[in-house]
Amino acid sequence: MIVRSKAPLRLGLAGGGSDVSPYSNIYGGLILNATINLYAYCTIEETDNGQIVIDAFDSHCHKSYSSAKLLMIDGDASLIKGVYNRIIHDYDLEAKSFKITTYNDAPAGSGLGTSSTMVVCILKAFIEWLSLPLGDYETSRLAYEIERKDLGLSGGKQDQYAAAFGGFNYMEFLPNDIVIVNPLKMKRWIVDELEASMVLYFTGASRSSAAIIDEQKKNTSSGNQTAIEAMHRIKQSAVDMKLALLKGDMAEFAHIIGQAWEDKKKMANGITNPTIQKAFDAVSYTHLTLPT
């Protein structure tokens, strides 16, 4: 039996960071995001040779293990092992024999939610293979727990829900880990206009968001009012952007991104660097003068 799955990467359009605890647990978070036509891929091939073979092309990891109920988390293929260990444990299953192959259209650290999307993608493949009774909400929640709690990787909640639900979504993150996903019904002409108005620009550098997120958590826990007030405004930007998008107001959409970026830089050191700021300034302030 061979099972294939894919899950879409996402653009965080507004509210980014308000889905991270403890802020979301204290104040509640709001996120507006959209998935794009870049994906994480997973293939599982059931075998009978008593081996677990991992070909993780996204992390350049190629390993083989004897079939077991628990795979040691040692830095190699941690996302795959984390999903496997949790499923075997939660559903009290016997050790499995299989080959798993993963690939991602974007590099890790590109800011598109690659790791969380891969966890959802791997989960979806196991769900199909083992006929597990998990819907999109349950899959998202389980992916979050695997990545944040089991593996101890810092981050928020939006990426897992974006990958599982897909499309344009307005998400609410409430205390007690309650998440509500509100799909936006976008008119086709607005989506076309948005695509024509945006450029997805890769700086050429990948980086881990863990240090930035850890600083955001610290600022909230310590009561840093500058950072907290900035996050309040970032959260409000998700509300404002939802209205702008539904009306097709691209000028207001761009204005909200600019204002939110200024607030984002107040959240933690390392949010920006000279390369990122130069690119942002180029698209924000460069004007084309046509001959008259």
Predicted regions and their residues:
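Glycine-rich beta-strand-to-loop/alpha-helix junction loops that act as flexible
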Residues: 15-17, 114
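Short, proline-centered helix/strand-breaking motifs
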Residues: 107, 288-291
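Short, histidine-centered active-site or binding-site loop motifs used for metal coordination
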Residues: 17, 58, 104-106
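DPxDG-like acidic metal-binding loop motif
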Residues: 112-132, 136
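Glycine- and acidic-rich phosphate- and metal-coordinating loops
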Residues: 84-108, 142
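Short, internal active-site loops enriched in acidic
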Residues: 103-109, 148, 167
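C-terminal nucleotide
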Residues: 1-12, 19-25, 31-33, 37-89, ...
